[in-house]
Swiss-Prot record:
It comes from the Bacteria. This is Deoxyuridine 5'-triphosphate nucleotidohydrolase. GO terms for molecular function: dUTP diphosphatase activity; magnesium ion binding. It comes from Beijerinckia indica subsp. indica (strain ATCC 9039 / DSM 1715 / NCIMB 8712). Belongs to the dUTPase family. InterPro entries: dUTPase, dUTPase-like, dUTPase-like_sf, dUTPase_trimeric. Keywords: Hydrolase, Magnesium, Metal-binding, Nucleotide metabolism. CDD domains: trimeric_dUTPase (cd07557). It holds the Pfam family dUTPase. The keyword ATP-binding does not apply. It catalyses: dUTP + H2O = dUMP + diphosphate + H(+).
Length: 160
């Protein structure tokens, strides 16, 4: 007997005045993991993100994320591939107790200026369960095959 999928969390969304007329963040396909976030720039404004430049962009929305969940602001792959534009602090974590406007820090790693206007989809928001761990201080840790090796220590190249 298969169990029905768990009910997705409900997130309350507060629309700020500068987001009037913009669509709510939304999944673009039935299988999408992320809700698209759009720039809530003033009408008629074009923001030019120069190569190497970064800017904090408003989305015009605040969220009430349920306890036990978080949201991550992540890059849109098309912006990165086509223009070299990505989210600087990726992933940007939105905690369940944060109630301010969702902002997106974009950086242009490309060679050309990138223009952003009101409604440009600039990032995606992925909601996921999270837990707070209990840390217990100790003088020793259990041994593993890997041990203290890190940063590329598990190998290089292909697995042939």
């Amino acid at each position: 007997m298969t169990m029905p999928p768990p009910r997705p969390p409900r997130i309350l969304v507060k629309r700020l005045a500068h987001a009037e007329g913009l669509a709510l963040p939304a999944y673009q396909t039935a299988g999408a993991a992320g809700l698209d976030l759009a720039a809530a720039l003033p009408h008629g404004t074009t923001l030019v993100l120069e190569p190497g430049g970064r800017h904090l962009l408003p989305t015009g929305f605040c969220l009430e994320i349920p306890e036990g969940y978080e949201a991550q602001v992540r890059p849109r792959s098309g912006l990165a591939r086509k223009h070299g534009v990505t989210v600087l602090n990726t992933p940007g974590t939105i905690d369940a107790d944060y109630r301010g406007e969702i902002g997106v820090i974009l950086i242009n790693m490309g060679d050309e200026p990138f223009e952003i206007v009101r409604g440009t989809r600039i990032a995606q928001l992925v909601v996921a369960p999270c837990v707070q761990a209990e840390l217990i201080e100790t003088h020793t840790l259990s041994d593993t095959e890997r041990g203290e090796d890190g940063f590329g220590s598990t190998g290089h190249g292909s697995h042939q």
